[in-house]
Amino acid sequence: MRLINLVGLFFLLFSFTMTGRNLLVRQSGKELRQHPRLLFSKQEEQRIRDLFGTEPLLDSLRASLMKEAERLLAVPPQEDPRRKIKNTKDILSVSREQVYRMVNLALAYRLSGERRFAEKAEKELVHVCNFSDWDPIHYLDVAEMTTAVAIGYDWLGGWFG
């Protein structure tokens, strides 16, 4: 159920933002300096915000996102499974869960402006960045974790020092 909600949220949010003009490569230095850069721009984010209250499905998805972000506030950061299970190198499930957490927490912060979501996302990012590695032998573990960190860093914008 979580995955389908997340996928639905993405498709809905970004379907409202796609126009021919937005498909052009952005070359303006000013636009590239603003956050977010990954998956949507600040202008596209504003268009989504403008639709709140006018689209019941979007409002429902936003409520689901905020509820899940609230739940994640109480969830401890994930541990590196290689510390507890000998002879395992796989952290793919941890990497995928980290993408899920970053999307939820960082988007909740962007849509609500509530610092607690950004603070929790920052703790999560620092925690996974302190893993000894992200299992470089298995490229997908690294790719998923890199995606999580990139989205978190970008969507939290100027939150970091």
Task: Walk through the language-model features, giving the residues of each.
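N-terminal pre-domain segments of enzymes
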Residues: N22-I48
